[in-house]
Structures are given as structure tokens and as C-alpha cells.
């Protein structure tokens, strides 16, 4: 197991649960045949202990111990608030 802490940036896409949000992480991969860059999206369930985020916020998340069946990430900071 790696000792390095995994930190990712993403956008909040769902906030219908108590103390939990769904964060969408976008990354670029290169197609092996066509050599074109393609966007891929991963959705993570993130623990938000203070319920301080809204949909559309740009956030930083960090991997942690499993909090529930699907939550293994915790919110570390809000980088940019959304307009709505």
C-alpha cells in the first residue's frame, strides 16, 4: 500500500444526502488508436461533516478510511463557490 495521500479536485454534482455529497472527477485519457484526448468522469461519494457545500462548488477531496459502504473520501476544502 502506498504511503502517499490521494488528493483530487472535483465538482459537486449531488447534495441530497445528509453529511454526504457526490463529487464528479474529470480526467483526460489518450485513445490508444486515434491518439485523441477523451474526457472520463468518476463519481465519488464524499463525507461533508458540516453540510457546507452546494451543487456546482469546486472542492478538494482526500482519501480516508471507509466511513460507510460507499464513502471513502472526505471533503478537505472548498476552492470555489458556485453562483447559484
UniProtKB/Swiss-Prot annotation:
<protein>
    <recommendedName>
        <fullName>Small ribosomal subunit protein uS17</fullName>
    </recommendedName>
</protein>
<keyword id="KW-0694">RNA-binding</keyword>
<dbReference type="InterPro" id="IPR012340">
    <property type="entry name" value="NA-bd_OB-fold"/>
</dbReference>
<dbReference type="InterPro" id="IPR000266">
    <property type="entry name" value="Ribosomal_uS17"/>
</dbReference>
<keyword id="KW-0689">Ribosomal protein</keyword>
<dbReference type="InterPro" id="IPR019984">
    <property type="entry name" value="Ribosomal_uS17_bact/chlr"/>
</dbReference>
<dbReference type="Pfam" id="PF00366">
    <property type="entry name" value="Ribosomal_S17"/>
</dbReference>
<dbReference type="GO" id="GO:0019843">
    <property type="term" value="F:rRNA binding"/>
</dbReference>
<comment type="subunit">
    <text>Part of the 30S ribosomal subunit.</text>
</comment>
<dbReference type="InterPro" id="IPR019979">
    <property type="entry name" value="Ribosomal_uS17_CS"/>
</dbReference>
<keyword id="KW-0687">Ribonucleoprotein</keyword>
<keyword id="KW-0699">rRNA-binding</keyword>
<comment type="function">
    <text>One of the primary rRNA binding proteins, it binds specifically to the 5'-end of 16S ribosomal RNA.</text>
</comment>
<comment type="similarity">
    <text>Belongs to the universal ribosomal protein uS17 family.</text>
</comment>
<dbReference type="GO" id="GO:0006412">
    <property type="term" value="P:translation"/>
</dbReference>
<dbReference type="GO" id="GO:0003735">
    <property type="term" value="F:structural constituent of ribosome"/>
</dbReference>
<dbReference type="GO" id="GO:0022627">
    <property type="term" value="C:cytosolic small ribosomal subunit"/>
</dbReference>
